Amino acid sequence: MKTTIILILLTHWVYSQNPTSGNNTATLCLGHHAVANGTLVKTITDDQIEVTNATELVQSISIGKICNNSYRVLDGRNCTLIDAMLGDPHCDVFQYENWDLFIERSSAFSNCYPYDIPDYASLRSIVASSGTLEFTAEGFTWTGVTQNGRSGACKRGSADSFFSRLNWLTKSGNSYPILNVTMPNNKNFDKLYIWGIHHPSSNKEQTKLYIQESGRVTVSTERSQQTVIPNIGSRPWVRGQSGRISIYWTIVKPGDILTINSNGNLVAPRGYFKLRTGKSSVMRSDAPIDTCVSECITPNGSIPNDKPFQNVNKVTYGKCPKYIRQNTLKLATGMRNVPEKQIRGIFGAIAGFIENGWEGMVDGWYGFRYQNSEGTGQAADLKSTQAAIDQINGKLNRVIERTNEKFHQIEKEFSEVEGRIQDLEKYVEDTKIDLWSYNAELLVALENQHTIDLTDAEMNKLFEKTRRQLRENAEDMGGGCFKIYHKCDNACIGSIRNGTYDHYIYRDEALNNRFQIKGVELKSGYKDWILWISFAISCFLICVVLLGFIMWACQKGNIRCNICI
């Protein structure tokens, strides 16, 4: 019985040696913010590392419509840009229009004399970048020919008509004299002249319209010359016509002279388009145009430009994210995430940052947990938190500044004759996209590595700052925790947090308590051994007492034991 009492007292003494439960000591642990479910990001050294927070850098969807702000967006409806420029009757509404972006619809069609443009893409690009269909008529003198030719394939209302910006010249009577007309450019801007040549469907039509069996058109300036002859022959019927018109264009610089020489088949200019330099463009899209604001437009619709990358469409207009092949790239905007462990030690110990993060700390990234005579508590360290946030906040903006294009990426078209150029251009574009995709992944991985390193460094700075303050008044318990060997109430804990702790005030008390506690302190491993040994001895003594009682009862005859074989 005495032995049992001694063991019970010993067990109580072991429990009483928990230094964190006394009034003369305190425990302070440093920790960092954690979340239950973090986000996986890629760094230089790890393919997947979990962080508390991350921002998606790739815009993968459009808003489904084209915003008419911040740019002047002109809906071409049933007209292509070239038809509007030539003056197709059903496109007269676009005369003298201006735009930042001209939208061509898949439903657009031509409704005049059938034509082709040998260098269609270049002309379309020149007119689109000019951003206007401003046209000025000039007084060309065409002597000895009939002007204003018309066709039943080109109706303006119910009457036969023709392209409003072109003048179809045919014979006058039985003659078609050689034409030689000049027009100087006395302006201080470039002039764009549109002209053409008619290809009759037969020799009979050729002589009927132009007398000569074969015509010729030569258009020249001081810098260039083009000579075109008609290709007479039947072609597939389009709007009742098997003939064709080929459209050409000439740019006349200030001080230069336009010269037109022809003996037949000439479709003459009526004036010029004023060329302007700018960043206007044209885009094919069937997305609806609506009232909204966006600085980036794609054929799929407008997209936000608050991300540095996008994989919506390679064709863009405006201030747009860089196109890459990846569907997702995440930029770490938080620290390394170590989800909090819920299991506590035998004495309810509080854990520090080495073991795990703290999910309950919502007002900061770094902080303190403490246990003292007044209980337990937690508080964030705002200074170290702000230091980390300041370094991370500018990352997204810096990445956007490095990658957002301040120009438009126009559509590129090539005729079948230029197939090899088209293949080369496609190869170059694909190579650029591959390079940017690789660079984007590398850039994000580098930034993520830097973010994780700097947040870890801030945690270590806070730990070292606390250790230097406490000095010999506390012992580093490992795992980011300190055992403080003096009475440290909440005000004392607050002074450690804000950096005003004076270790000299508590030095004598801490030194005295350290020696007293060290003299009787048993480490947690020995406490566990004592508990197990005392439990085993108690069980053994109970068994001995029970066996002795049985033997005593048998001797007195109070218990009979019969053994049958």
Swiss-Prot record:
Gene3D superfamilies xref list: 3.90.20.10, 3.90.209.20
- Tell me the protein's name: Hemagglutinin
Q: How does it sit in the membrane?
A: Single-pass type I membrane protein
- Oligomeric and partner information: Homotrimer of disulfide-linked HA1-HA2.
Topological domains annotated Cytoplasmic: 551-565
Q: Which cysteines does the record link by disulfide bonds?
A: 29-481, 67-292, 79-91, 112-154, 296-320, 488-492
**Glycosylated where?**
23, 37, 53, 68, 78, 180, 300, 498
Q: Which gene encodes it?
A: HA
What's this chain's function? Binds to sialic acid-containing receptors on the cell surface, bringing about the attachment of the virus particle to the cell. This attachment induces virion internalization of about two third of the virus particles through clathrin-dependent endocytosis and about one third through a clathrin- and caveolin-independent pathway. Plays a major role in the determination of host range restriction and virulence. Class I viral fusion protein.
Q: Which GO terms describe its biological process?
A: clathrin-dependent endocytosis of virus by host cell; fusion of virus membrane with host endosome membrane; fusion of virus membrane with host plasma membrane; viral budding from plasma membrane; virion attachment to host cell
Lipid-modified sites (S-palmitoyl cysteine): 554, 561, 564
Which SUPFAM superfamilies does this UniProt record tie to the protein?
A: Influenza hemagglutinin (stalk), Viral protein domain
**General remark:** Major glycoprotein, comprises over 80% of the envelope proteins present in virus particle.
Provide the site residues for: Cleavage.
344-345
Q: How is it modified after translation?
A: Palmitoylated.
Q: Which GO terms describe its cellular component?
A: host cell plasma membrane; membrane; viral envelope; virion membrane
